[in-house]
Amino acid sequence: CYSLIDQAKGVLALAGLLCDIGKIRVRPELLSRASGLDPAEMIEVRRHVQDGLDILAKTPGLPHAVLDAVATHHERHDGSGYPNGLQGVDIPMFGRIMGIVDSYDAMTSPRPHAAARAPHDAVMELYEGRDTLHQSELVEQFIQTCGIYPAGSLVELSDGRVGVITEVHALKRLRPSLMLLLDEGKQRLPEFHSLDMGVTFEDAHGRPLTVKCSLCAGAHGVDNFELFLD
């Protein structure tokens, strides 16, 4: 049967697709500008929330929870968000969740005014902002779900190889699956190889194999966004 959990997932998926639909009414030059916006321009950009609701109002059959999420995904736990400065539990649950997802997506995607950040760094910033920008319990659940090194993270292993995380294992979050891209000398592999750290515990020299660190997108000339497009 179609459970409440399935319904919630459907709402979040649809809200994720539609939350910024109002930006189609924002002047493109404002969205692509690398420098800051003046107050009037900021008001215009922030109006995308109401513009999105106006567009979706013409779409019959959308769950009210989806509209709530679209309306409130820029609200923040401490009241510093927009458009209405809602605080805490006054923000609908799906809006609170979408706020976390939207923040994470913004930090890990290349933008005109900022380079994409490593997923690990974005997760840490979300954690530091818990109970200020976002509800603590939801942030911690998001991190638990994604793992310390979320899928899409570019990482270096203890033996020097570099890869992109493709899957995080629920019971072994520090031992993900990867697509290996570079060898120990940071040279591109002729063919990409899969590695499941959940079953591979040692490197070629018999030493413990671990994730050494998270790397920024573009490190060592690797564009992991391009990889997923390919």
What are these regions (language model features)?
Residues C1-D230:
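Histidine- and acidic-residue-rich, metal-dependent catalytic cores
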